[in-house]
């Protein structure tokens, strides 16, 4: 079965994550999308009340089950800074994929 790994990460971590993916044998490819959002947090300034959205990147990888743990670990180890807001990773089942 195939899985979709979706990660929301800080923009400056993407290059390190891509480099880590290059070390995974048979890595299937990825999509990187500019996005904005916010998680559970307290507002820290007047600016936050005007525009709570922070820029981030969404990384999507469709992969076989056997590769998912490697992909998730590569993201976790290269996106982690230890600060709140480092991101989140979702792993979901892919019901069907159709090449165009």
Identify the role of each PLM range:
Residues 1-100:
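Positively charged, small/polar-rich N-terminal and surface patches that mediate targeting and assembly
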């Amino acid at each position: 079965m195939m899985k979709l790994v979706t990660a929301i990460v800080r923009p400056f971590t993407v290059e390190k994550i891509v480099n880590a993916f290059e070390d995974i044998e048979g890595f299937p490819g990825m999509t990187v999308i500019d996005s904005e959002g916010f998680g559970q947090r307290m507002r820290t300034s007047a600016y936050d009340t005007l525009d709570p959205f922070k820029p981030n990147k969404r990384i999507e990888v469709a992969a076989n089950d056997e590769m998912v743990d490697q992909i998730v670990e590569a993201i976790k180890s290269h996106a982690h800074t230890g600060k709140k807001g480092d991101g989140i990773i979702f792993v979901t089942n892919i019901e069907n994929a159709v090449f165009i």
